[in-house]
Amino acid sequence: MKLNIFASAILLCTSAFPVAASRLDKPYTEVYRPQYHFSPKENWMNDPNGLVYDTDEGIYHIYFQYNPGGTTWGAMSWGHATSRDLMHWTEHPVALRARGFPDNITEMFFSGTVVVDESNTSGFGRKGKVPWVAIYTSYYPMEQVLPSGKRVRKDQQAQSIAYSLDKGMTWTTYDAANPVIAEPPAPYHDQHLEFRDPSVFWHVETSRWVAVVSLAKLHKILIYTSQDLKQWDWVSEFGPANAVGGVWECPSIFPLTLDGSQQDKWVLMLGLNPGGPPGTIGSGTQYIVGDFNGTTFTADADSIYDGSGPNDGMIFEDFEGDESLAARGWATTGDFINASPVRGTLSGQNAVTGFQGQQLFNTFLNGDATTGAITSAPFDITYKYINFLVGGGNDINETAIRLNVNGKTVHASTGSNDEHLTWQSWDVSSLKGQRAVIEIIDNASDGWGHINVDQICFSNTRATNQIANWLDWGPDFYAALSFNGLDRDQRTILAWMNNWQYGAAIPTDPWRSAMTVPRRLALKTIDGKPSLVQQPAGRWRTSGNHGREFSFRAVDGVRPLGRLGKALDIELTFSSNMSPSNGLGEFGVSIAATKGYQYGTRVGYDFATQQVFVDRSRSGDVSFDATFPGVYHAPLSNSANGTISLRILLDWSSVEVFGAHGEATITSQIFPGPDAVYGQLFSSGGQTRDVSLQVREIQSTWH
């Protein structure tokens, strides 16, 4: 749960796109209203909270961060909804309303968990009724003495509990003793403003309740145990590890079997804000695989990253030292004649991060107006991979690093319109023995008209651009939480489908924010290490049993598909054996596109980098925040059978992509125009073969 005050100014849409829905519209038919994702009837929503499955009644309960008084963050309370199938939802009255709402708020209810206390360890049960217990963060906006007699400071965050004797429909706060964890333990007393988001479960082997709570700014998770949910003992901590670009929030920990065997591993999920996946701006969710003994979480070595890149092979260029580019053996043109590597961020540039050592090649010398190129001395290709760090502009024709063989470009890469440098790799195994040069070009002079490059190295190991295991590589997946009460092999999560960067500005009304589709998790060995995979858990009603099917022996260029619809379940498979010209090749489908295809969302696969991508740069209304348009990538290796498969879930204002078995996912909001119901296939850089496409139109779950 993030304490965040958004800027109140929201840019209006241009006339090309619909303005926010009118409150006079029929509920759940408003412009951009999700048709099969949960969203509240009205007002602001963020983190999912207290997800629990009632095994007796067969009902899923979701609680969520909710503002009962408006469409921006504030007056944090717990909303509530239920479903029997994870698809059709009934919204209920607010479960935990901010104390003193609306005019004299003394306590807000931040994120937390609900557990079913079957053995009545808490003692809250009465007359045979099993208590449900909510464990949440209390946020106190003012110094005060509580009904329990405990004194809290202004803006303090502490952990409290409430209980329900009617299966989660109404709640009683434990005012006699709240908060039950008033402050962080002694070493961290000064962190009482950043101590939040308890996730609680019953640990069978030790017969104890376990809670994980975030020390947000320190990138630490505190682990507590309890026998009764009232008295808690701090037993260990974990962190920092992997991604630490922003605060850690919304932690949770749970077991999964590895590869469907009897071997258990434990997964720690963590929200990060900002500092999400490469190419995104704002929040994201990472995970770490390891072991848990009831008190201590120990990460697997292969689940932790140091970001240093491969340690074999040779460094071709690290841009360190005092020599000019020409003195280092680079041929220079344009503004790069007499230029030298630079020490990080230049005047007028956003912070440049992710490079190694003290220096890098940064073409922002005189701002984006700088143009030119540098070309390395020729070299023989003797290793399997060429690895490098790259950031900056995302224009393959204007701002790129290229590999040229015999005067032809065989590989090229760019940044992601982001100043953070990430690892990219070219597989040059088929080019061994040939002579090549590396060229870095900057022919662009407008926004993002620059490129950052560092640490070019030759290796037999592909570099990873990962600093973390990302649960989702898109910009709109945060605060993921799993349901308590389900069997281990049914581990199911929801996440907030929005981003703190622009969440209060998205053009929706009278509600703001939706949840992702529910996703079933599994743990599988991929590329030699345990990795989370996820698949949609719902079965939505579609138009017809098979929908529309397309089959093409080969696609080259574009192939219009006609009118497809606004809410779709798409399955796309194609051969991974494309031989792209000039080292460049993409295949995919444009969806939610206008009739003339001036606007649309591109979902596809980059054969050169082996990445699935979502491009929402021209998806519709992107005017409300400068960081909203973008292209997002997730690594997806070729399959053993030589095919790539993508499942794409399109709703009225979102797209979720699941690559292969679900090891690569991208979640992205979009806000297309009213006529954006068309689609077309695209193949650039060569032919894509053996294309199969199935499109089913999903019916609304609200009507």
From Swiss-Prot:
What's its top-level EC category? hydrolase
Hey, which family's this protein in? Answer: Belongs to the glycosyl hydrolase 32 family.
What processes does the entry annotate via GO biological process terms?
A: sucrose catabolic process
Keywords in alphabetical order, please.
Answer: Glycoprotein, Glycosidase, Hydrolase, Signal
Which residues are noted as glycosylation sites?
A: 104, 120, 293, 397, 443, 641
The name under which this protein is listed is Putative glycosyl hydrolase ecdE
Q: Which domain of life is it from?
A: Eukaryota
Give the signal sequence positions. Answer: 1-21
**SUPFAM superfamilies reported in the protein's UniProt record:** Arabinanase/levansucrase/invertase (SSF75005), Concanavalin A-like lectins/glucanases (SSF49899)
Which residues catalyse the reaction? 47
